[in-house]
């Protein structure tokens, strides 16, 4: 493994240790975070946000690394980026265009958008892991990241549902979320078309994980620190 790969792996392991230590200190690793449901949660909102921000940042880092690895190995000179622009299955969600717009968006709307994005990725992440496992010669660097992202996405969704329950007690988050229909493209026998579909999915994952990370940090600053950050 080259020095760059070792450095990236070391950084990820360090972040995992930090997250694990935080969760151990909070007593939320060996037992459920809220054993009696979000309405009776004993973990503070600040701690829930701290955990969520770190997990979302970790997911975005993994997504970026996985996309870059796939781009380097399978997409050079193929022009996949021109087909990937504006073709994400989550494009129908009315997300803020930039950080300034996000800052002007009500916190309940931002939380609903985060929940919608996370839920919309449950299915494609499951199939991404399955299809990468079956990909001939797929590097472990891509598969291992896909597995981690699928697991962390579920954890982050659970955490965001708890945060939503604390910030807006009694509210029920029932907004519909986009459904992914790209599995046939990941399974086509046309190799270029299949790689293009993988490229598009990873490009969208990197984009959406960046949005989630940005929105979560804004919410953390606004709700926990009263915008003093």
UniProtKB/Swiss-Prot annotation:
It is found in: Secreted. Disulfide bonds join 34-41, 88-204, 221-229. GO terms for cellular component: cytosol; endoplasmic reticulum lumen; endoplasmic reticulum membrane; extracellular space. It comes from the Eukaryota. One of its GO terms (biological process) is cell surface receptor signaling pathway. Residues 1-30 form the signal peptide. The modification Phosphoserine is found at residues 56, 64, 120. Keywords: Disulfide bond, Hormone, Lactation, Phosphoprotein, Secreted, Signal. GO terms for molecular function: hormone activity; prolactin receptor binding. Prolactin acts primarily on the mammary gland by promoting lactation. Interacts with PRLR. Belongs to the somatotropin/prolactin family. This is Prolactin.
């Amino acid at each position: 493994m080259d020095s760059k790969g070792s450095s990236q792996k070391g950084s990820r392991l360090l972040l995992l240790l930090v997250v694990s230590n935080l969760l151990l200190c909070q007593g939320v690793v060996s037992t459920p975070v809220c054993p009696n449901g979000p309405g009776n949660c004993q973990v503070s909102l600040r701690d829930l946000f701290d955990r969520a921000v770190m997990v979302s940042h970790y997911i975005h880092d993994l997504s970026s690394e996985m996309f870059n690895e796939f781009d380097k190995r399978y997409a050079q000179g193929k022009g996949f980026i021109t087909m990937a622009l504006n073709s994400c299955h989550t494009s129908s969600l009315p997300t803020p265009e930039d950080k300034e717009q996000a800052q002007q968006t009500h916190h309940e709307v931002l939380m609903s958008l985060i929940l919608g994005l996370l839920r919309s990725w449950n299915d494609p992440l499951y199939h991404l892991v399955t299809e990468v496992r079956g990909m001939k010669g797929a590097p472990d660097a891509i598969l291992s990241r896909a597995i981690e992202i699928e697991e962390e996405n579920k954890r982050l969704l659970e955490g965001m549902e708890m945060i939503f329950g604390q910030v807006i007690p009694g509210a029920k988050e029932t907004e519909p979320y986009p459904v992914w229909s790209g599995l046939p493209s990941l399974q086509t026998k046309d190799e270029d078309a299949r790689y293009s579909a993988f490229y598009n999915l990873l490009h969208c994952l990197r984009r959406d994980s960046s949005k989630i990370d940005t929105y979560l940090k804004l919410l953390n600053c606004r709700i926990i620190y009263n915008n003093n950050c």
